[in-house]
């Protein structure tokens, strides 16, 4: 498989069939430009939650912003119960309905048909980005599937179930980033998947107390009995010995996933390799912080300080 592909060609080099496009009118050009501008504004307003966006090459910033706006809006519906700024908090059923509407709008935009006015700017930008970079619609639908699961699923019976959730909630983002940069090969995808899943898991082990307050427990239930853990243990102010042992087990197997993805940055050009390396180091350091607290994420949420972030930047730069 070619390392780098023309976004309008398949990995084998064959030109992909596309329907003949109509010549863009000034109106559609302006609508698309305005859609991207709104996506960029949303992304910039959330730089604290999406710092890697600052390092994206200028030519890719509109496309990355379109992907971010899509994911952010759907996540807000699922997690915050808000489908528009200043809107009322949605019930569980209303969230599911709006997520179905969002999925329908994605499919409608695929056909070049109008989408709901409140989301038209998002799907205008996403449709244009998908066409330019040949991004599979399945990756966007996987994200929506995971957001829908956030509304209805609060416990995970097995680690395999949790991995499947991460496959849809985290891995598509890494694959989209690679595709936007022109990389489309299975080896990089597998390594990216390992990093993205590990990042998602690291966040779970960091946020055990935070998630409990939201009614969620991501620690697989199959491991509770093994370490003598009960659901009530997650409501305590400090972690029991069983919870600590269980989280130690989760942290160690998450490190194994980070190790699987470790070769990825070396196969990528600057600045993408730097971005991925910083991301990898950040997730690994979160696991270090969980371990440094003796695996007690109930007592206090492990975080990275300013000095930690400076060290990550230096390590990321000099390890390339």
Task: Name each model-derived stretch.
Residues 26-200, 205, 209-320:
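Catalytic cores of Mg2+-dependent Asp-rich isoprenoid enzymes
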Residues 1-26:
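Intrinsic disorder/low-complexity segments
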